[in-house]
Curated annotation (Swiss-Prot):
Gene name in the database record: oleV
Annotated GO biological process: antibiotic biosynthetic process
Membership in a protein family: Belongs to the hexose 2,3-dehydratase family.
Binding site for dTDP-4-dehydro-6-deoxy-alpha-D-glucose 2: S176, W296, R359, Q375, C376, R377, N380, Y381
Highest taxon of the lineage: Bacteria
Keyword annotations: Antibiotic biosynthesis, Lyase
Reactions that this protein is recorded to catalyse: dTDP-4-dehydro-6-deoxy-alpha-D-glucose = dTDP-3,4-didehydro-2,6-dideoxy-alpha-D-glucose + H2O
Lyase among keywords: yes
Binding site for dTDP-4-dehydro-6-deoxy-alpha-D-glucose 1: W54, T137, R138, S139, N140, Y141, E413, G414, G415, R416
Protein name: dTDP-4-dehydro-6-deoxy-alpha-D-glucopyranose 2,3-dehydratase
Complexes and interactors: Homodimer.
């Protein structure tokens, strides 16, 4: 056990079975292409008045569903002492329901496999992406939409007798766009054979991680659940051989229990507690119409900032061939420009460490969470005074290409965001990169980050995505 986390060898035994259900990556991609042809999704931008079941409240201007479920677009007033201007109002997604993001896993011939879903979301870049086995809000799996049920939900809602729970933790989502949003991230090992639907397929854990080297293929929800998994040992419980590539070997070593860390876990937790205690973050829900005081404007087609920055809220009408319901309409939040999420790494005492930032975001539940070294939308900082630019932003943007170990565009959640993407980057810093860092930064090994990921609200969603991505290199 490591700080309450069972090693994978303790959590899972080998489950050898016939390998007929398990195919090579090539066959997997052929299946995915077939699902792309079969699963059509048509998304049309429409004025707000054409959003069926949605309306602006006469008193507050809030955009909400007539059922009172799903989510709403409201206003949020924020005051903080950790931003270049300390108070503002903004639109924000309010979705108090806790959804389920669940991966079903099983061993075939001793190799751990993951059951993924080929799923199209209205905001996806490139259409269909790989989702967890279950990706559903409470409104969806309680069938508020009066559509079909959620396949394999029973493994996560009532796992006893069906599966063994390996990970089960509430995690935050994008704090700049959601207010106090959390989802239940679960990994369940199936105990018996699992009947397959056409839109679901087994892929090895290693194969799925390698697909993270491709842009816009493994969706955000799959990445966050993957980040909760410890490294998978060889079927006999021994650690697999270290990779030959130097950085891959460094990642593998940093993931191991015996890796020497610069700070103890107690010191890391004390640091984050101190950051949360000394920073101000005051949040107040206000009518959406009050965001006008901070420059937000609404017309028939969008809610947008007068300067064209940050994001817009738009309406879409959707027709789908393979979803619980065949058509619907909804608002989506559309960011302005791509984001950047970067890990700066370096070896300390011979062990790879990641530089994490205690980052405050408008909608987070408990104040700062551990975020990537750099997390921002660079376009939003083009007119910001130099002293308020994110620390290490210029270092990452000017990094020697020979020191960039991962650099891929990945999509964010397509059910609430329209074409939201981040450039995910891992930089291996030079040996003379300072070990001494500003007060709101700390060096952690990957093993320490994985330990934190089995507890709620420590590591934010962008950092969790990067944890999944960096393991694709090991």
């Amino acid at each position: 056990m490591i700080w309450g986390i069972p090693a994978m060898s303790e959590a899972m035994g080998s489950v050898p079975t016939a390998g007929s259900e398990v195919s090579s990556t090539c066959a997997f991609l052929s299946w995915l292409d077939a699902r792309r042809r079969a699963n059509r999704l048509t998304v049309e931008h429409v004025p707000f008045r054409e959003l069926s079941g949605w309306q602006f409240d006469e008193n507050t201007g809030n955009l909400r569903h007539t059922s009172g479920r799903f989510f709403s677009i409201e206003g949020l007033r924020v005051r903080t002492d950790h931003c270049w201007f300390g108070s503002w109002t903004q639109p924000i997604i309010v979705q108090p329901e806790i959804g389920i993001l669940g991966l079903l896993v099983k061993r075939f011939d001793g190799i751990l496999h993951v059951l993924v879903q080929a799923k199209n979301e209205p905001g996806n870049i490139g259409g269909l992406q790989l989702s967890p086995t279950v990706q559903a809000t409470r409104s969806n799996y309680t069938r508020v939409h009066r559509g079909g049920g959620v396949r394999y939900l029973e493994y996560f809602a009532s796992p006893r007798g069906r599966g063994r729970v390996l990970a089960d933790v509430l995690q935050s989502e994008q704090g700049s766009w959601f207010l106090h949003k959390r989802n239940r991230n679960m990994v369940v090992e199936a105990l018996d054979d699992v009947p397959l639907d056409d839109d679901f397929h087994w892929i090895s854990l290693g194969g799925l991680r390698k697909l993270l080297l491709r842009p816009h293929l493994v969706n955000m929800d799959t990445r966050t659940v993957l980040s909760c998994l410890p490294p998978d040992p060889a079927p006999d419980g021994r650690q697999p051989p270290a990779p030959a590539a130097p950085f891959a070997a460094a990642v593998t070593r940093s993931l191991t229990r015996g890796a020497t860390a610069l700070h103890t876990m107690g010191e890391i937790l004390g640091w984050l507690t101190d950051e949360r205690s000394r920073r101000e973050l005051v949040q107040q829900r206000v009518p959406l119409e009050e965001t006008a005081f901070s420059g937000w404007r609404r017309d028939d087609h969008a809610i947008a900032h007068k300067d064209g920055d940050y994001f817009r809220v738009i309406g879409v009408s959707v027709r789908a061939s393979s979803r619980e319901v065949s058509s619907w309409s909804q608002p989506l939040l559309a960011p302005v420009g791509p984001g950047l999420a970067a890990f700066v790494t370096r070896r300390i005492r011979g062990v790879l460490h990641v530089l994490l930032h205690a980052r405050t975001e408008a909608g987070l539940l408990n104040g700062p969470e551990m975020a990537p070294t750099v997390q921002c939308r660079p376009l939003n900082y083009r007119a910001v005074p130099a002293e308020y630019r994110p620390a290490y932003l210029d270092y990452v943007l000017s990094a020697d290409p020979g020191r960039i170990r991962y650099d891929t565009l990945q999509s964010e959640e397509g059910g609430r965001f329209h074409h939201a993407e981040n450039r995910y980057v891992v930089v291996e810093a030079e040996d003379d990169f300072p070990v001494e860092v500003p007060r709101d930064f700390r060096w952690l090994t990957l093993h320490q980050i994985l330990a934190l990921l089995h507890h709620s609200n420590y590591v934010n969603v962008e950092a969790r995505s990067l944890v999944a991505c960096i393991q694709a290199l090991s």
